[in-house]
From Swiss-Prot:
PROSITE patterns for this protein: RIBOSOMAL_L36
Coiled coil: none
Taxonomic source organism: Dinoroseobacter shibae (strain DSM 16493 / NCIMB 14021 / DFL 12)
One GO term (biological process): translation
NCBIfam families: PRK00831.1, rpmJ_bact
Name of this protein: Large ribosomal subunit protein bL36
Pfam families: Ribosomal_L36 (PF00444)
Highest taxon, organism lineage: Bacteria
CC per GO annotation: ribonucleoprotein complex; ribosome
Protein family per UniProt: Belongs to the bacterial ribosomal protein bL36 family.
Signal peptide: none
GO MF assignments: structural constituent of ribosome
Amino acid sequence: MKVKNSLRSLKQRHRDCRVVRRKGRVYVINKTQRRFKARQG
């Protein structure tokens, strides 16, 4: 999982990427290509 300051470029890496909020943190998840996970921090 990548940790980045800004998720703007990471959410455009794949068309299935979704931005979700969990426990006060912002994540990019991808159900089809799981290698595109990222967290803002």
